[in-house]
């Protein structure tokens, strides 16, 4: 694909989050539907892979997990990770609160008109942006790309004005006016 797009080849990265609050650790990720026991993995949403039609079959579905005491299977292979993005409990809880609201377009497609396909990076970028975590400084490791990241940010920012017009602070839920 890099050759077709006339850009240098680089490593590709997959995003996931681990959120710690006093009572538990949660893993947030988008992954293939493994079996029919989604509740054990904290599945809060699901979508199709490739096409809506194919999504009728489990092999062509993904799930969004908010997995209490879950684990990221390939975390030991992570590059330049983990990265602490916030340290206060309020922000951590806000991240947990927005996960179930994440859009679930077809994975690998640009159904939301962002110019990038929707994937695991889109989900994590959307969750961070909608929860009030500053995403401007988050970058993939040197020499790498995180396809779909911009799609998640774009969709989150499209939704942001609705929240601000309503006069509600998207981080605290309180009034946005001082």
Placement of each model-derived feature along the sequence:
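Short terminal or interdomain "cap/linker" segment that borders an active site or interface and mediates
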Residues: 141-178
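An acidic- and aromatic-residue-enriched active-site/binding cleft used to recognize and process polar
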Residues: 31-33, 140-143
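Tryptophan-centered motif/residue detector
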Residues: 14-15, 118, 126, 149
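Short glycine-/small-residue-rich flexible loop motifs, especially phosphate/cofactor-binding loops
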Residues: 96, 121, 125, 141
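Surface-exposed patches in mature extracellular/periplasmic domains of secreted proteins
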Residues: 107-111, 135-140
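Short helix-capping/linker segments at secondary-structure and domain boundaries
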Residues: 24, 129-137
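Non-catalytic ligand/cofactor/substrate-binding and regulatory segments of enzyme domains
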Residues: 1-113, 159-161, 165-171
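Active-site nucleophilic cysteine motif
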Residues: 109-131
């Amino acid at each position: 694909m890099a050759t077709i797009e006339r850009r240098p080849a680089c490593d590709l990265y997959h995003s996931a989050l681990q959120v710690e609050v006093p009572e538990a650790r949660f893993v947030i990720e988008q992954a293939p539907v493994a079996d029919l026991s989604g509740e054990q993995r904290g599945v809060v949403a699901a979508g199709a892979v490739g096409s809506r039609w194919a999504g009728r079959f489990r092999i062509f579905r993904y799930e969004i997990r908010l997995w209490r005491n879950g684990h990221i299977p390939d975390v030991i292979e992570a590059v330049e990770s983990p990265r602490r993005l916030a340290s206060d409990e309020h922000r951590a809880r806000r991240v947990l609160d927005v996960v179930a609201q994440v859009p679930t377009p077809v994975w690998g497609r640009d159904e939301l008109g962002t110019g990038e396909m929707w994937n695991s990076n889109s989900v994590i970028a959307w969750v961070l942006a909608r929860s009030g975590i500053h995403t401007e400084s988050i970058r993939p490791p040197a020499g790498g790309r995180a396809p779909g990241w911009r799609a998640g940010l774009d969709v989150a920012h499209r939704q942001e004005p609705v929240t601000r017009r309503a006069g509600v602070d998207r981080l605290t839920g309180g009034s946005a006016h001082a």
